[in-house]
């Protein structure tokens, strides 16, 4: 789907990993590593080059309520519940996804279940390259 991605991945012990797992059970969808996407739809070389570059790490602050977004892949529709994030007083550049589903829209009552998240501090983040070619359940970190 999203080919090779460059992520800020939350450290293993961060509570958002458990939160995303809980939402995946509640909404009957696949769990995935808690992450903030830096870039997606890269090839291996592009991701490797970017990973080796100078990527700044920030503190991220939740801004507003979670929203549903859609991305079309041919005849399929990818739905995501995303929490917009603010960084350096800028909104709309980054988000953290809390749930994903294919071809089944999230309903208003499902969005209402999503709780507020705490700020994500830069010391809780690592930069990694992830393989996001297939279904969400198959996404995996290639290297940090």
Predicted regions and their residues:
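Histidine-dependent nucleotide/RNA phosphoesterase domain, centered on the 2H-phosphoesterase fold
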Residues: 1-144
